[in-house]
Amino acid sequence: MKQRLYLSGPITGVPNYMDIFNRAEAVLVGAGYQVVNPANMCYVLNSEASHEDYMRVDMEMLRMCDVLVQLPGWEKSIGCNREYGMALERDMVILEYTKFTEGVKNA
């Protein structure tokens, strides 16, 4: 069974976050992983949803995963730090995205 990876990266205040998340997802899927991309899950909630509403959905998605993959800039994000804390509590494997992209062009 393929490992399921959760992408953790800053979204709030990052204008091109969809491009960043989608590019990372493509690289990881191409490497044979199942990827949970929270940036693509915004359709689950309506336009009036709060940051906390999104975090609840994100945390549920994280619970379904085996590995937390941290995108550049994660450490500056409150939401990413919450995801990191949950991953630590659950003894999940935690990896930096750059581990997957060493030697890969345009990753």
Residue ranges, per PLM feature:
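Conserved catalytic or regulatory cores that recognize and/or transform ribose-phosphate-containing ligands
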Residues: 1-107
